From Swiss-Prot:
It holds the Pfam family HSP70. Belongs to the heat shock protein 70 family. PROSITE patterns: HSP70_1 (PS00297), HSP70_2 (PS00329), HSP70_3 (PS01036). HAMAP family: DnaK. It comes from the Bacteria. The keyword Nucleotide-binding applies. This is Chaperone protein DnaK. It comes from Azorhizobium caulinodans (strain ATCC 43989 / DSM 5975 / JCM 20966 / LMG 6465 / NBRC 14845 / NCIMB 13405 / ORS 571). Disulfide bonds: none annotated. The lineage of its organism: Bacteria, Pseudomonadati, Pseudomonadota, Alphaproteobacteria, Hyphomicrobiales. The keyword Nucleotide-binding applies.
């Protein structure tokens, strides 16, 4: 059985880990890094780049470089958060045919699940090259506060990447697994997870291998990206005051600002001051303009204090739902790159009244937890039981647009709940069941997950038919709903596919796309390698011809020159096979030249049969002669 891997699919960075015996191991990618930027880019000629190579060219190719796409996954185009996101990114966010938010590059539309799949493919390849075998199954993490549509879209991304997603696991829960696996003592912990794009807080009880989530809360649109944008806006405002130019209108300058802001933010976690230096950031009639600015930690903290403050309310609600006070928390575990910021640590300490635990690597701990859960599913990790919860209440719309809850938030999953409803009018023969997720009292204020019709109800006075609605939430937090007319036994069941979302045909098409992309990438690599070999041979043959061409016969020299010309022509094409064939032909034709070179070399060594030491002495003598000449 092939290994099941654990993947932390992050907003800013992703990470992959696997169980090696009894302990989890984070796997380094092809670039030698333990985390991979969650960035996908397309070059002008359509080549796809993922991770660090994509990040490196982001400044010069902002419109085709997709970052923080996790913020769009499972969201509708007219969602207010998407509206906000469109203003923050240099790439195009567009409305898909199904009403979802997608992205566009050179007229081709991609779903956020597809972009995420390209990142997952990279993680899959990273694991495969380390393990030396094919990987087909994975555990993938999501923010605890992700709704059903976002979880389903993440599962779809795995499928597009060629992975069977055995389990979707919440990020704070994964972190708790990694933190508590080898600890013998029991206790109550809070996991404070502030990542690149999302914030979660979970309260768990740990003891005897049982990890029980008591409550969870969060904000799926709050993270490091927002901290970066605060700094970008501050720098742009200061520059505008000074130079009268708004850098936000220039996509290239905006991307440079974003990179500088991220770098400054990271530096200010360890230094109290940093300098931002961006020469030639823009130009006007008077010439080029440079941005140089000193930034103190105190100034940065003042710019983002309200963002950190926003994380405190979910912490308060999570404690309230768990029925605990801050003093009853034994340990606070910090997760996510943003928790390296001293001000974040300080505010967490103030809120919980204790020094937070910094013994886990905030960038890797979630992937490690996913690998442990993969080990549990594989049977390699024994005596570990994970009891997670659903983050949001689930229910249906009833008379007057009221949201009637069937399953309350923080209910342990998997779970199943049924309730009987009736018709609202006399003679009603069909009922539309509209399914919502959220905490507001009116259905319209919550997130609609989908709707379906139960038809063929025998006509009867209002209130007489009995319709039983059953909600079923699996261990991934994904919902199935069925409705049954108890009179006729007629049943209608759906796996909630978000009002948008990808259907099976979409996913199949994207799987094929991903496979053809992988094939294209292989072709590109083969072409690049063929050109490298060909160009190297052209160079060495030309050099050899100029130095030793007189040592072979005219016919042989003509054959070499002809093969050389043919290879040069082939190198101007995109045909890898033709280049390889012509490279082979030139190598064959040059054999005689190689022989002539070797025999000339050996012939030169015959007289006096000089030793190596003498050769070195001769070099020194030449230098001395030069010195005498110049004297």
């Amino acid at each position: 059985m092939s290994k099941i891997i654990g993947i932390d699919l992050g907003t800013t960075n992703s990470c992959v880990a696997v169980m090696e015996g009894a302990s989890p191991k984070v796997i380094e990618n092809a670039e030698g890094a333990r985390t991979t930027p969650s960035i996908v880019a397309f070059t002008e000629d359509g080549e796809r780049l993922v991770g660090q190579p994509a990040k490196r060219q982001g400044v010069t190719n902002p419109e085709r470089t997709f970052f923080a796409v996790k913020r769009l996954i499972g969201r509708r185009y007219d969602d207010p958060t998407v509206e906000k996101d469109k203003k923050l990114v240099p790439y195009k966010v567009v409305r898909a045919d199904n009403g979802d938010a997608w992205v566009e590059s050179d007229g081709k539309k991609y779903s956020p699940s597809q972009i995420s799949a390209f990142i997952l493919q990279k993680m899959k390849e990273t694991a495969e090259s380390f393990l030396g075998e094919k990987v087909e199954k994975a555990v993938i993490t999501v923010p605890a506060y992700f709704n059903d549509a976002q979880r389903q879209a993440t599962k779809d991304a795995g499928r597009i990447a060629g992975l069977e997603v055995l389990r979707i696991i919440n990020e704070p829960t994964a972190a708790a697994l990694a933190y508590g696996l080898d600890k013998k003592n029991s206790g109550t912990i809070a996991v404070y997870d502030l990542g690149g794009g999302t914030f979660d807080v979970s309260v768990l009880e740990i003891g005897d291998g049982v990890f029980e989530v008591k409550s969870t809360n969060g904000d799926t649109f709050l993270g490091g990206e927002d901290f970066d944008m605060r700094l970008v806006n501050y720098l742009a405002d200061e520059f505008k005051k000074e130079q009268g130019i708004d850098l936000r209108n220039d996509k290239l300058a905006l991307q440079r600002l974003k990179e500088a802001a991220e770098k400054a933010k990271i530096e200010l976690s360890s230094a109290t001051q940093t300098e931002i230096n961006l020469p030639f950031i823009t130009a006007d009639a008077s010439g080029p303009k440079h941005l140089t600015m000193k930034l103190t930690r105190a100034k940065f903290e003042a710019l983002v204090e309200d963002l950190i403050q926003r994380t405190m309310e979910p912490c308060r609600l999570a404690l309230k739902d768990a029925g605990l006070s801050a003093g009853q928390i034994d340990e606070v575990v910090l997760v996510g790159g943003m928790t390296r910021m001293p001000k974040v640590q300080e505010m967490v300490k103030q809120f919980f009244g204790k020094e937070p635990h910094k013994g886990v690597n905030p960038d890797e701990v979630v992937a490690i937890g996913a690998a442990i859960q993969a080990g549990v599913l594989q049977g390699d990790v024994k005596d570990v039981l994970l009891l997670d919860v659903t983050p949001l209440s689930l229910g249906i719309e009833t008379l007057g647009g009221v949201f009637t809850r069937l399953i309350d938030r923080n209910t342990t999953i998997p779970t199943k709940k049924s309730q009987v409803f009736s018709t609202a009018e006399d003679g009603q023969t069909a009922v539309t069941i509209r399914v919502f997720q959220g905490e507001r009292e009116m259905a319209a204020d919550n997130k609609i997950l989908g709707q379906f019709d139960l038809v063929g109800i025998p006509p009867a006075p209002r209130g007489v038919p009995q319709i039983e609605v059953t909600f079923d939430i699996d261990a991934n937090g994904i919902v199935q709903v069925s409705a049954k007319d108890k009179g006729t036994g007629k049943e209608q069941q759906i796996r909630i596919q978000a009002s948008g979302g990808l259907n099976d045909a979409d996913i199949e098409k994207m799987v094929k796309d991903a496979e053809s992309h992988a094939a294209d990438d292989k072709k590109r690599r083969a072409l690049a390698e063929a050109k490298n070999h060909g160009e190297a041979l052209v160079h060495s043959t030309e050099k050899a011809l100029s130095e030793h061409g007189d040592k072979v016969g005219a016919a042989e020299k003509g054959a070499i020159e002809s093969a050389l010309g043919e290879l040069k022509t082939a190198l101007t094409t995109e045909d890898a096979e033709a280049i390889q064939a012509k490279t082979q032909a030139l190598a064959q034709a040059s054999l005689k030249l190689g022989e002539a070179m070797y025999s000339a070399q050996q012939g030169g060594e015959q007289p006096g049969a000089a030793k190596k030491d003498d050769v070195v002495d001769a070099e020194f003598t030449e230098v001395d002669d030069d010195k005498k000449k110049s004297a």
